[in-house]
Amino acid sequence: MGDQVQFARMNGLGNKILVVDMRGRKDRVTPQAAIALNADPATEFDQIMAIHDPKSAGTDAWIDIVNSDGSMAQACGNGTRCVVQALAAETGRKAFLFHTVAGLLEAKEHDNGTISVDMGKPRFGWDQIPLAEEFHDTRRIELQIGPIDAPVLHSPSVASMGNPHAIFWVENDVWSYELDRFGPLLENHPIFPERANISIARIRSRQEMDLRTWERGAGLTLACGSAACAAAVNGARTGRTERMVTVNVPGGPLKIEWRERDDHVIMTGPAEWEWSGTVDPVTGIFARNEPESGDNGARAL
């Protein structure tokens, strides 16, 4: 085996996360390593959260986010909660400030074990999302799947939560749509020059919605935190919901608040530790640690 680092297999409401400790190193998890890890059923994942030494004063870490296809992501709310749980177990602290390519992320662990992440302000400008064409109102853009006179999905609300999202509002059960079929087509639609996360959302009340997501670079997942935030924000700005909602993703509920005083989006939910090991961040070759007697719950990396 080559040069190994510590990593943990975790999940945020079923969103499969590998938290990799790259502190003290100058290199990064390679796309080849990500693809190799995703090809093994033991380490198949949705996102890698690679923890690096901080690049700016006052922050606790720089985090690289890698999708299962080896591409880089700008945001992963569920993965951020997993990082918080691992670092809280390591340090005994409750609050953290991370830096990512999308900006700063504040996060804290609550006494009940849930974790809140400040995902920052949503962006609605067509060139901020970004879109390939100018739209003055991104609450509803011209995009559809299916026949012109009877589209299956149409007129999504779009926004950026550090990464681009399109939310299609539907009347039927979110499970009745072939998202595994439509997702790749919409993710790679020319209107999205950086590709996009594609979600279908059904409103249950002004305080609750159901959501399924095809994640850019990862495919169908049980949970996508940034998509839940994008859906909640778009629900509020289109008049469908209040600014505080429960978003039911396949893995369970997330609490999302679009805070009025500063427009920041706060996501709250759980994280779960599964197992740990060592991995070569260049090749993806890994070894699983033997569990200790009575080993359960969150542990330090």
UniProtKB/Swiss-Prot annotation:
The Enzyme Commission number assigned here is 5.1.1.7
**Reaction(s) catalyzed by this protein?**
(2S,6S)-2,6-diaminopimelate = meso-2,6-diaminopimelate
Write out the entry's keywords from A to Z: Amino-acid biosynthesis, Cytoplasm, Isomerase, Lysine biosynthesis
Where is this protein primarily located? cytoplasm
Entry's Pfam families? Answer: DAP_epimerase
Q: Which residues bind substrate?
A: 15, 47, 67, 77-78, 163, 197, 215-216, 225-226
Question: Could you tell me where this protein is found in the cell?
Answer: Cytoplasm
Question: GO: which molecular function terms?
Answer: diaminopimelate epimerase activity
Q: Where in the chain is the site Could be important to modulate the pK values of the two catalytic cysteine residues?
A: 165, 215
The pathway is:
Amino-acid biosynthesis; L-lysine biosynthesis via DAP pathway; DL-2,6-diaminopimelate from LL-2,6-diaminopimelate: step 1/1
The organism's superkingdom is given as Bacteria
Q: Which InterPro entries does its entry note? A: DAP_epimerase_AS, DAP_epimerase_DapF
Q: Which GO terms describe its cellular component?
A: cytosol
Q: What does this protein do?
A: Catalyzes the stereoinversion of LL-2,6-diaminopimelate (L,L-DAP) to meso-diaminopimelate (meso-DAP), a precursor of L-lysine and an essential component of the bacterial peptidoglycan.
Fill in the subunit field for this protein: Homodimer.
Report the sequence similarity comment from the record.
Belongs to the diaminopimelate epimerase family.
Q: Which HAMAP family match?
A: DAP_epimerase
- Identify this protein by name: Diaminopimelate epimerase
Print the organism lineage.
Bacteria, Pseudomonadati, Pseudomonadota, Alphaproteobacteria, Hyphomicrobiales
